[in-house]
Each structure stands twice: as C-alpha cells, then as structure tokens.
Amino acid sequence: MNKKELFDAFDGFSQNLMVTLADIEAMKKQVQGLVEENTILRLENTKLRERLSQLEHENLAKTSSKQGKDHLEGIYDEGFHICNFFYGQRRENDEECMFCRELLDRK
C-alpha cells in the first residue's frame, strides 16, 4: 500500500467518523428531547393522580354523608324520631316532627 492509498484510506475513515459523530449528536438531541418530555409527562401524571385521589376522597365523603341521611330518613319513615329531643321514641300516629324534619331538610 503506497502513501497515497494510505492517506486516502485515512481520509475516508475520517469522513466516516464525522458522519457517525453527526449521527450520534442527532441521537443525543433526540434522547434529550425524549427525557424532557418524559419528565413533563411524569409530573403531569403525578398531578393527575393527586387530583383523582382528591376527587375520590370528596366523592366518598359525599356518599357516606348521603348514606347517613338516607338511613335517618328510613328510621323516620318507620315512625321513629331522629331529632335530639326525642331520638328513638315512636312518633304518635306518625305525626310530623318539626325537629326531625329540620334535620332531614338540611343540606
């Protein structure tokens, strides 16, 4: 192999290295963009999970409150007082009690 062929081989090898280096830099930028996007999506996912948990907690509180009110309505409909003054006593002739009604009509 003479000197010219040797220099041509080195020149070709050098050009291949430059192309490879450019490809690596492009891949590096792409990976960096993906990492940034992944970080943003992770943060958004965390916030959404927190919000979902908060909504589930609020829904559970509303449900348990409604179930308690429904239970009191059932007791009242069976003919018993649910007010603080006469709780558990039977209502005479299923008469309305303004104290019990006030409890049931609260929001």
UniProtKB/Swiss-Prot annotation:
Sites where the protein binds Zn(2+): 81, 83, 97, 100
UniProtKB keywords: Cytoplasm, DNA replication, DNA replication inhibitor, Metal-binding, Zinc
Cofactor(s) this protein cannot do without: Zn(2+)
GO aspect biological process, one term: DNA replication
Similarity comment: Belongs to the YabA family.
Quaternary structure annotation from Swiss-Prot or TrEMBL: Homotetramer. Interacts with both DnaA and DnaN, acting as a bridge between these two proteins.
Entry protein name: Replication initiation control protein YabA
Record organism: Streptococcus equi subsp. zooepidemicus (strain MGCS10565)
